[in-house]
Amino acid sequence: MASCNMASAASNFLVATPNVASNTNTSRTTMLFFSSKNYGSTAPRLVVRAAEEAAPPAAAATAEPAEAPVKAAKPPPIGPKRGTKVRILRKESYWYKGTGSVVACDQDPNTRYPVVVRFNKVNYANVSTNNYALDEIEEVK
């Protein structure tokens, strides 16, 4: 019965990798070559080619430091402040027309329900907090 050696099945192996992350105009290629052929009495050879990269220009070190940019004014806070008493206007809510206190308010304008409200009374699932949209609550004076 004939047998096959995996080393003889893959007689040559070549890898060529271009330097993609280079920010210079020169390109660099690294090549690896493995051969299972025996050339006379020498063992198989490994060939590696590599090019040295040029040193980055030192222009950034000699440039004068730029002035700090003027900070833009903070946008006004979204929603009620923490601890504010609010009335719930969402009709399908367990706490509809009830009052609770604001625990947190997400400042991201893309958040659908940014206001977290905590209540003294728990609902049927034994939960005492819920998230609401800005138009589903009103502040109680």
UniProtKB/Swiss-Prot annotation:
Family annotation (InterPro entries): Elect_transpt_acc-like_dom_sf, PSI_PsaE
Keywords: Chloroplast, Membrane, Photosynthesis, Photosystem I, Plastid, Thylakoid, Transit peptide
Annotated organelle transit peptide span: 1-49
SUPFAM superfamilies the UniProt entry points to: Electron transport accessory proteins (SSF50090)
One Pfam family from the record: PSI_PsaE
Entries under Gene3D superfamilies matching the protein: 2.30.30.50
Gene Ontology, cellular component aspect: chloroplast thylakoid membrane; photosystem I reaction center
Location within or outside the cell: Plastid, Chloroplast thylakoid membrane
Modification after translation, per record: 2 isoforms exists (ratio 1:1). With or without the N-terminal alanine.
Predominant localisation class: plastid
Region named Disordered: 57-83
Membrane topology: Peripheral membrane protein
Origin: domain of life: Eukaryota
Function: Stabilizes the interaction between PsaC and the PSI core, assists the docking of the ferredoxin to PSI and interacts with ferredoxin-NADP oxidoreductase.
Family named by the database record: Belongs to the PsaE family.
Protein name: Photosystem I reaction center subunit IV A, chloroplastic
Originating gene: PSAEA
